[in-house]
Amino acid sequence: MATELQTEQRELAKFIRAGASRGPQCFGSYFDEKGGSCALGAVYDAVYHLPREHGKLIPDHLERLFRCLDEVTKRCPHEGCHKRLPLAPMLVHLNDDHVWTREQIADWLTAESQ
């Protein structure tokens, strides 16, 4: 039986995939001026249905998402990396440091929550 946190992780993966379909991937920030998003930005985009022309309205933090972002700690799945981080920084780490696609991150989250 899936725990509540595992269910939230699967939901998070679903939002990453949905947000990833809305624009290109970016690195180093949640959003960029070209309409791109990182993995966490993709979640925010999918949950809040951000307008395509966001201009200066780029959110600088995520609120009211899922408790699993803070409460779940994971080991980095990238070969040779030994970091252990809470889920939110882990998503940023995989996106920015290992340049994983948002879809790869969502797939990993889904597999981890089974």
Per-segment meaning from a language model:
Residues 1-37, 43-114:
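Domain-length accessory/inserted modules outside core catalytic folds
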